[in-house]
Regions:
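Amide-donor transfer/coupling interface in amidating biosynthetic enzymes
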Residues: 1-6, 31-155
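Short hydrophobic/aromatic-enriched beta-strand-loop microsegments
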Residues: 26-30
Length: 155
């Protein structure tokens, strides 16, 4: 997607894979790292509203396009992962952090297209969270812009 100039939205494992693809590293078991939170799912038998509900807050990096687009500086996210970003890959910059400092959202600084990845799952309980809807709207707008730009180049 990045090589072709396509808009990119990475969620959970996609967030981690973007980092790995650019030379970054992961904590394999975040919960075993001193001073890090347990980001894993708490109770897989709980109803969806609890299982995929808010787990911890994230603070957005000030004055980034992400903070400006969402119009907030922090919000709560679900958390269902055992791995997490240890070191950022080449050309990646953080957009949000968990209270323990773990990178929860990032983007590519060295490409021209829309790129956004996040550790949480905005596709769950989207109807209850206008910020999740805004994220998908931004991605949808980028996809439509890409399509329109490439249609105009057809013969």
């Amino acid at each position: 997607a990045l090589e072709r100039g396509l808009p990119f939205l990475g969620v959970c494992r996609g967030h981690q894979e973007l980092n790995i693809s650019r030379g970054g590293t992961l904590y394999q078991k975040v919960h075993e790292v001193p001073n890090m939170m347990d980001h894993r799912e708490k109770d897989s038998t709980a109803p969806n509203e609890i299982q995929y509900g808010p787990h911890h807050d994230v603070k957005l990096v000030p004055n980034t396009w992400f903070e400006k687009s969402l119009g907030v500086s922090e919000f709560w996210v679900n958390s269902l992962h055992g791995q997490g970003i240890k070191t950022l890959g080449k050309g990646l910059a953080p957009l949000a952090h968990a209270p323990d400092g773990l990178v929860e959202a990032m983007y590519c600084t060295d490409v021209n297209q829309f790129t956004l990845s996040m550790q949480w799952h905005p596709e769950w309980l989207t109807h209850e969270n206008p910020l999740w809807i805004k994220i998908f709207e931004m991605y949808g707008d980028a996809c439509r812009d890409f399509r329109a730009a490439h249609r105009s180049h057809r013969v």
